[in-house]
Regions:
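Residues on the lipid-exposed face of transmembrane beta-strands in outer-membrane beta-barrel proteins
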Residues: 48-52, 82-86, 117-121, 147-151, ...
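Detector for outer-membrane/organellar transmembrane beta-barrel domains
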Residues: 125, 129, 142-227
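Repeated loop/turn-to-beta-strand initiation elements of outer-membrane beta-barrel proteins
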Residues: 23-25, 55-61, 89-96, 123-130, ...
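Short glycine/proline- and aromatic-enriched beta-strand/turn motifs that initiate or cap beta-hairpins
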Residues: 19-71, 91, 157, 294-301
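Gram-negative bacterial Sec-dependent N-terminal signal peptides
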Residues: 1-20
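Flexible, glycine-rich linker and terminal segments associated
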Residues: 21-26, 170, 194-198, 219, ...
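Residues that define the transmembrane beta-barrel architecture of outer-membrane proteins
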Residues: 40-46, 76-80, 110-115, 124, ...
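Outer-membrane beta-barrel pore domains and translocons
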Residues: 28-34, 62-66, 97-101, 122, ...
Length: 301
């Protein structure tokens, strides 16, 4: 938790001091209530990220915090990332980042540290990035390897695919995971489609919104998860948003999750701040795993 607070403060100070060099900044604070068979779970979610450029150097920071209130028992999850990149030769960029995962469940805490280095090529249309991440000892894995390919159709639309391999500790079985994403961020509508495959698990998620007026709009989401070709989770949601100011809006969504015949109803209310997003070129493996897995598994609180 200390690292979480320090990193949030650093990102805040940095983005204020270097506002003229800000390349992107976004944040979200949402509250979700889930009700299934009389059991209620409340979820508080916070995410903030920012990046800024200083010449050929770019710096970035990301903070994610999720709190689950399970009938009085709390489960806290946090992710903090700090990193820097260096662009050279017109088309090339190298980067290094540090990420810490922390969890505190039912009074028991644990953390995992990940250090990643990457090298990428981007000519404005096509990009490729390779990365290696070292995981701390006793995390269950030694390393995470990744290769990302991307295509930038225009300034608002991009597509990417990536392949990741998690190398297990002590001769355990390695795991492979693939991600495919399509994103469109326009003035009238936004659309995100994500697919994740990992051994016998397949998930797909669709999230979008449409602006009816300059202030009001509708939004919706779909997600499906299958294991061994058996459908184990379906999620459908619909709602709306109100644009308070440029880049700042309030979202509200009601949704239903069907898992093996058991229904869970939920409602989410959130405040979003969006001044651009991190480009695919600058996404770390952790970025891709967090965003694609959350959206495709219907965990977009």
């Amino acid at each position: 938790m200390r690292l979480l607070m320090v990193s949030a403060a650093l990102v805040s100070v940095a983005t204020g001091a270097y506002a003229q060099n800000l390349s992107y900044a976004n944040g979200e604070l949402s509250f979700t209530s889930l009700d299934g068979d009389g059991d209620t779970t409340d979820v508080t979610y916070f995410e903030g990220s920012a990046g800024f450029d200083v010449g050929a150097v770019d710096l970035f920071g990301d903070v994610i915090f999720t709190e689950f209130d399970l009938s009085g028992d709390d489960v806290d999850l946090s992710t903090v990332s700090l990193g820097a990149g260096y662009s050279f030769g017109g088309w090339y960029r190298t980067d290094v980042s540090y990420t810490q995962f922390e969890n505190d469940a039912f009074g028991f805490g644990d953390s995992t540290d990940v250090t990643e280095v990457g090298l990428g090529f981007n000519d404005g249309l096509f990009l490729v990035r390779g990365a290696y991440a070292a995981l701390e000892e006793d995390s269950g894995a030694d390393a995470l390897y990744g290769l990302t390919l991307g295509l930038q159709f225009n300034e608002n639309t991009d597509a990417s695919v990536s392949r990741h391999r998690l190398e297990a500790e002590d001769g355990g079985e390695d795991e492979n995971l693939s991600i495919a994403s399509l994103n469109h961020n326009g003035d009238i509508f936004e659309l995100e489609i994500d697919m994740v495959t990992a051994d016998d698990v397949f998930s797909v998620g669709l999230n979008g919104n449409y602006a009816i007026t300059s202030r009001f709009g509708v939004l919706g989401s779909l997600a499906q998860v299958s294991i061994d070709d058996d459908d184990v989770l379906d999620r459908i949601g619909a709602g709306g948003f109100y644009q308070i100011a440029d880049g700042l809006r309030i979202d509200a969504e009601i949704f239903r999750i069907d898992s093996d015949g058991d229904d869970v109803d939920g409602i989410t209310v959130g405040l979003r701040y969006d001044m651009g997003a991190k480009s695919v070129e600058r996404e770390t493996q952790i970025d891709r795993l967090n965003s694609a897995v959350n959206r495709s598994f219907g965990l977009n609180f």
